[in-house]
């Protein structure tokens, strides 16, 4: 069994010449992407679709972007990746629909042994990383090997994620901890205690209503949504 096979089976392996040979495709494609006219959005997206193992519709990547293999990265629809993202995809990295990455997001499926005597032999490992649907990852976040992030989670800027993150939570810190749960009451606010203005909120309600069956918009409890929307509208009426 060679080291590429060991890596793909989740075993420890050594990055020898055969392993580095497998990385050359990604290096050529990322070099191409990172040296393109940055206003050529569709051209960059076309290279990303060639680079990634699976790719949904309507994606946008702002170069520079770096990865090890590319083929181990799977992204869903409406993926937005801001500047200077690094994905060490020595194992599979799956990213769901409607995910947003701020600048300098780092996703590390790769790792090394704790003990230096083991580490210095050259053996390393890789563990899958799974990111659910509708996840927003803030700037300078680091996601470590083996982590799963649940749907609709928000990861605060500068966080170091070493453990699984539950769905519908806001998390932040080093190490990353739960700050609070996200509820449907949050639809009233866009930043801290800043509320959406009436025009913006009514436009969002229209978009939700017109797209109620396409699965893009998630709510924790749709049954309570009319009550929340009514309360927000009453606030507009009352000034």
Where are these regions (language model features)?
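Terminal amphipathic alpha-helical/low-complexity segments used for targeting or macromolecular assembly
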Residues: 1-58, 176-239
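A generic "structured core" feature
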Residues: 60, 130-132, 136, 154-156, ...
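Beta-rich strand-turn-strand
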Residues: 139-164
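Acidic, glycine-centered active-site loop in nucleotide-sugar glycosyltransferases
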Residues: 165-167, 172-175
């Amino acid at each position: 069994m060679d080291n590429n096979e060991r890596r793909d089976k989740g075993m420890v392996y050594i990055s020898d010449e055969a392993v580095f040979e497998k990385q050359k495709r990604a290096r050529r494609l990322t070099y191409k992407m990172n040296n393109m006219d940055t206003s050529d959005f569709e051209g960059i997206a076309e290279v990303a679709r060639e680079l990634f193992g699976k790719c949904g519709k309507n994606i946008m990547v702002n170069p520079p972007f770096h990865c090890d293999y590319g083929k181990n990265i799977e992204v869903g629809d409406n993926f937005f990746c801001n500047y200077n993202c690094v994905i060490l995809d020595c194992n599979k990295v799956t990213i769901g629909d409607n995910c947003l990455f701020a600048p300098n997001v780092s996703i590390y499926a790769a790792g090394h042994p704790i003990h230096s005597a083991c580490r210095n032999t050259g053996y390393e490992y890789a563990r899958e990383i799974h990111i659910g649907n509708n996840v927003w990852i803030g700037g300078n976040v680091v996601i470590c090997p083996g982590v799963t992030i649940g749907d609709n989670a928000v990861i605060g800027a500068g966080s170091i994620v070493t453990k699984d993150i539950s769905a519908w939570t806001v998390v932040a810190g080093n190490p990353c901890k739960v700050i609070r749960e996200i509820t449907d009451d949050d639809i009233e606010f866009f930043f801290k205690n800043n509320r959406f203005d009436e025009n913006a909120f009514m436009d969002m309600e229209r978009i939700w209503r017109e797209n109620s069956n396409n699965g893009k918009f998630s709510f924790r409890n749709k049954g309570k949504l009319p009550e929340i929307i009514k309360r927000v509208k009453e606030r507009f009426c009352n000034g």
